[in-house]
Regions:
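Active-site Tyr-X1-5-Lys
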Residues: 17-21
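Flexible, glycine-rich beta-alpha linker
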Residues: 1-10
Length: 161
């Protein structure tokens, strides 16, 4: 979803950015899993930790995620939502290519639900809809090439200067 310090190097965000600006989605591999958590749900977790009794969270490690999905599943959601939100985009193709990057992440967040009662309220679809609205408002300038939105590119530029 939208964030004041937007990143387009995260799976949902980069796929949405490409669907809107390149009018296509390129998926490298596609079977890799990613846990997803909406930025507002993450903010809710931070508030929850700040207000939680210390005896419940002291020396504890919590996974916080939601919707473990494959990159291919995410790309299908992005395609559907962007085509709906941008009616001029009749058909956004999904191009799947081979990938040398087979990293796959999935997590179990049952512990935070059991101990603190946390359950995310927002979905990947909600995040894509928010991004579409933000793009329509013109909130992202040159979001394909501007290294402001890409942590590794930004750090390399800063390091080189």
């Amino acid at each position: 979803g939208y964030a004041p310090r937007q990143r387009f190097d995260l799976s949902v965000n980069i796929l949405t950015n490409n669907a809107i600006n390149k009018k296509k989605i390129t998926v490298f591999g596609g079977k890799q899993l990613r846990p997803n958590l909406h930025i507002q749900d993450y903010c809710d977790v931070v508030k929850l930790f700040l207000s939680a009794p210390s005896e419940k969270i002291n020396n504890q490690i919590f996974n916080v995620g939601y919707q473990n999905m494959s990159i291919s599943e995410i790309s299908e959601i992005v395609k559907r939502v962007v085509q709906k939100e941008f009616s001029l985009y009749k058909e956004i193709p999904i191009i799947t290519t081979k990938s040398d990057d087979n990293r796959s992440y999935h997590i179990n967040s049952d512990k935070i639900k059991q101990i603190l009662g946390f359950k995310p309220n927002r979905s990947v679809e909600d995040a894509v809809k928010e991004l579409c609205i933000s793009f329509k408002k013109g909130l992202f300038k040159n979001s394909i090439d501007n290294d402001f939105y890409f942590n590794v590119k930004r750090l390399k530029r800063i390091q080189a200067s």
